[in-house]
């Protein structure tokens, strides 16, 4: 899991409302009353995207937006780069090294273009690759649009292909690659731009489970090396708990709980969240602190309170001595 740089915010959502329709403002009073999406649509004809969403995301963090289909997670994600309109509230984005907060919904066309080219990159569920181009041409496409030097682009593409294990496929057409390999090309293209913020909208959900697991591992490896800020959309709880340093769970366009995987598993904020976590495997989430009490038996082997339970089980299998926190 990526560890956030403390007190170094890079994306902020402040009471964000997104409504689709010809008269979105007509839905605001009903949002304030806590009405549901179906109630708002029946009364106003407008479709609620997200309601009163507030989040602060730190540089280097992996935050997962999770929920069922239609919960608003992709809608909120696409507000970061101005793809979905914010009717009320504010989204602000900061580029590391630039002491400037920029609102993609209230900035000039030139500033928005700069944000999309240099600050924020995006990976979709559908790979969006150009089939008439080679693998290396697809990886370098964002750099080409940004007008980067050809020699520098070639070197950057070479580095990214090596990172995702596709160096030997650089000259191949993307149509010759499997789905998993094509998504690696999408990852390489996103990371090649060096944009500090990466938006990932269910990028692995259409893949076979084995390939999906492998790409999750590869993403974590890339993140450990490149340390980007990632906002990742998923409807898969195991995926969310594996990737996210924090998880924001959404229901009906609203954020119902945001916390670490351990916090969400141990203290679900609502029956909806409790139902999500009821059948998950807790071994990757819980630590010794959660399952052991502090004792002081002499001669007992001690472990740190944050030792994962999975590691603790292996230690118990390797010793007949007591283990204490």
PLM regions and their residue ranges:
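Helix-to-loop junction immediately C-terminal to a conserved catalytic motif
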Residues: 81
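ABC ATPase "signature
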Residues: 258-259, 267
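ABC ATPase NBD coupling module
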Residues: 40-44, 99-121, 268
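Conserved ABC ATPase "signature" region
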Residues: 30-39, 94-103, 140, 144-147, ...
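A short, proline-enriched helix->beta-strand linker immediately N-terminal to the Walker B motif
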Residues: 192-196
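Conserved ABC ATPase signature
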Residues: 173-177, 181-183
């Amino acid at each position: 899991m990526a560890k956030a740089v403390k007190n170094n915010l890079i994306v902020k959502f402040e009471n964000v409302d997104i409504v689709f329709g010809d008269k979105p403002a007509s839905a605001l009073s009903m949002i304030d009353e806590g009405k549901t999406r179906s109630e708002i649509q029946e009364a106003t004809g407008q479709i609620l995207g997200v309601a009163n969403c507030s989040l602060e995301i730190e540089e280097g963090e992996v935050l997962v937006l999770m929920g069922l289909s239609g919960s608003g997670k992709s809608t909120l994600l696409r507000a970061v780069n101005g793809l979905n309109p914010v009717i009320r509230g504010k989204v602000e984005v900061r580029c590391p090294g630039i002491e400037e907060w920029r609102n993609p919904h209230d900035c000039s066309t030139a500033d928005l273009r700069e944000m999309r080219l240099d600050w924020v990159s995006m990976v979709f569920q559908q790979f969006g690759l150009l089939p008439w181009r080679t693998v290396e041409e697809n990886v370098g496409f964002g750099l080409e649009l940004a007008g980067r030097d050809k020699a520098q682009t070639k070197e950057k593409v070479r580095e990214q292909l090596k990172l995702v294990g596709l160096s030997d496929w650089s000259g191949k057409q993307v149509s010759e690659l499997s789905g998993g390999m094509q998504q690696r090309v999408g990852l390489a293209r996103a990371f090649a731009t060096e944009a500090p913020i990466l938006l990932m909208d269910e990028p692995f959900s259409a893949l076979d489970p084995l390939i999906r697991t492998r790409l999750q591992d590869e993403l974590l490896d890339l993140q450990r090396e490149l340390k980007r800020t990632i906002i990742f959309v998923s409807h898969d709880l195991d995926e969310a708990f594996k990737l996210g340093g924090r998880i924001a769970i959404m229901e009906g366009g609203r954020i119902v709980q945001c916390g670490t995987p351990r916090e969400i598993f141990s203290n679900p904020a609502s029956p909806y969240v409790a139902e999500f976590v009821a059948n998950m495997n807790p071994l990757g989430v819980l630590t010794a602190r959660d399952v052991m009490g502090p004792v002081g038996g002499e001669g007992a082997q001690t472990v740190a309170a944050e030792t994962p339970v999975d590691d603790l089980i292996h230690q118990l299998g390797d010793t007949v001595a007591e283990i204490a926190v």
